[in-house]
Amino acid sequence: MRFDVAIVALKLTTKRTPLASARIALDLMDEGVIDAATALERTAELQEEDLGTLRLASQDTPGTQVEPLGQGIPASPGVVSGEIALDGQRAAARAGVGTSVVLVRQDAQTSDISALELALGLLTQRGARTAHAAVVARQLGKVCLVGCESLRIDLSARTVQIETMLLHEGDVITLDGNEGAVYSGAVAAVMVPDEVLLERLQALRTSQAVAPAHRKHGK
């Protein structure tokens, strides 16, 4: 089942990460949907230190190497760790007590949008980077891997199998949305600034700081 476009449009007016908010505002400005003043207003409170992508920490130190359980298609970048949640009810219950969760589904459905907002990431067995689930994840700034063909979900047993590894709902996994890898447990990550996005944002702020002076001078 695919996401309903109207519902997606409604849901995407809710919470986004700073990185997603900046990217969306700048893209809309570049496409002519909003003007520069509106883009500036929408990004005014964003801090540069928040505009980055998490990547796996260096594993050069002996003994720190970790091997992925499986591979999927990287659909939205970043690195997140959280408990496996197999449905929206579980995601809401665990997120409600402050626990980080990763939503794991065969294929995302319309009813999963609310759960995706609560989760840090999404892992699906089916789908492609252009699937609605992936688009929604990118708009919300959620890490997303789709098309993980080695993923098997047993809802009756509340278990997940990736290759030969059997995991239970509540076990912690890490999604690497940059490389499309799934890991068992929590894997250390570091924030890497999005230099291209920062340059675009700085150019916007500089141009809008100069514009009022030009208008004043022209009066």
Label for each model-derived stretch:
Residues 78-91, 95-100, 106-219:
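Acidic, glycine-rich flexible loop/linker segments
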Residues 31-33, 37-97, 101-109, 122:
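Long, charge-dense accessory insertions within large macromolecular proteins
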Residues 15, 22, 68, 72, ...:
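Generic hydrophobic-segment detector
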Residues 1-63, 168, 179-200:
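Terminal amphipathic helices with adjacent charged low-complexity linkers/tails
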Residues 10-11, 16-17, 67-68, 105-106, ...:
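Short secondary-structure boundary micro-motifs
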